[in-house]
Amino acid sequence: MRVKIVSKPTSQLNNIIEKIKNISTKLGFEVVDKDFDYVIAVGGDGTLLRAVKQNKPVIAVKAGRRGLLMDVPVDKFEEALLRLKKGDYEEEEYMLLEMIYNDKVELGFNEVGILYDRPEAIKVGISFDTERVSVEGDGVLVSTPQGSSGWGMSATNSLLYKDLSAIEIIFVNPIFYYLRSVVIPPKPLTLRLEDKGYPQTARAVVDGEVVTLIKTNQEITVRVSQRKAKILRFFKLDLIGEVLHAYHI
């Protein structure tokens, strides 16, 4: 079996990456950069974001400051690989979002949306089914259940359980609104940068990365992808407990 290791290029991880490579080789795995069967994500949630988009099953090794979805401790990595060879694991599938703009499609694991570009409020129109609403503030994000434990939680203080079939529309620092988010079934929706009487630009973001700038009256479409992110689980993932611990609740 062939594996690819994904991690941040930091000096703090050098020894851990070397250990991961040595164990993989010892157990008969070939470490490669392409034509691989599995991805080994070593780090935290940011590393996982990159790993799941490789379109292969992911082994999530926790070696970062924050890794709510990482279940394999470094000292149990060898045990995890042995169990992989035996087929002794569970495969979890996670929702992915597609952001469509200018005939391009970007894939998101946590969230996609529109955020302000300059230090001023923007007005975002939200459309799905027969609903048409506008929210003024710092922007609007559309989050997967797993994404609600990241950026979404800092904006809403709420959590969607990881295998819930729903998406969360998050209002980022809304003006004059007490409502912080709305949870809806996984259906397509449109986000539009509305006209406030003068030209504005906003950032279209996917998993915290700016993918393009949009102008007044331009829009993006968000829908649930037919693709799923696959993470192989070897140890129990106590998501709610990890969230409480991470935020010192």
Curated annotation (Swiss-Prot):
Class in the EC hierarchy, top level: transferase
One cellular component (GO) term of this entry: cytoplasm
Subcellular location: Cytoplasm
Gene3D superfamilies (alphabetical): Probable inorganic polyphosphate/atp-NAD kinase, domain 1, Probable inorganic polyphosphate/atp-NAD kinase, domain 2
Cited function: Involved in the regulation of the intracellular balance of NAD and NADP, and is a key enzyme in the biosynthesis of NADP. Catalyzes specifically the phosphorylation on 2'-hydroxyl of the adenosine moiety of NAD to yield NADP.
Similarity-based family: Belongs to the NAD kinase family.
Listed name of the protein: NAD kinase
Organism, as annotated: Saccharolobus islandicus (strain L.S.2.15 / Lassen #1) (Sulfolobus islandicus)
Gene: nadK
